[in-house]
Amino acid sequence: MYKRQIERAQQILCLLKEMSEEGSLPKDAKVFLDSPMAKKVTNVYKKWSELLSKHCQKFKNHPFEFPQLKLVKDVEESKKINDIERGCVIIAGSGMCTGGRILHHFKHRIWNPRNTVLFVGYQAKGTLGRKIIEGEKYIRIYHEDIIVKSKIVTINGFSAHADQKELISWMQEFDKLDRIFLIHGEYDKQVIFKSVIKNIMDKKAHIVEMKEKIYI
């Protein structure tokens, strides 16, 4: 499973904790959090657990601790995960699969049709993650071409970005809105959103190009 280290990893751990308590996560399953940064961030979340959402505070024990979870200590321990043949969950980064320990796990597992690669975040154009979800048959890792035979699944519900409806609602809160600039997102999505802004708000939006100068 690919993930981002800050917040996304903790959301996933919270859900797995819930599954563990409900019994839908097998007791003999192993869940590996294999990311130094995610591990450090999780410790920060633990320190300030009273500030977590009500959903995360409902558990009997800490939301980021459950019997199946193993926090991977170092690179050597990460490599030992390759010896596991039974079902397990590996949570690793980096964000869009452009580096980090996820590459190591891809090399050893993405060629196997018994495995599933689960994406829980956006993959930008040109990244390895985007190539995988678009059906690339071979990916290059550590100067080696690896065939992709694993099942590829994407869950979009973890996005931290506001959706189209939320952005429109936010803009409608302003008493005076003279100019709207679209600076984030893929171009085809920006074109659609520009049209939505015109239809709903009767406002013109400008799609900003790379290195374009805007004078206010």
Identify the function of each model-found stretch:
Residues 3-216:
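Acidic/His-rich, metal-assisted hydrolase cores and their charged scaffolds
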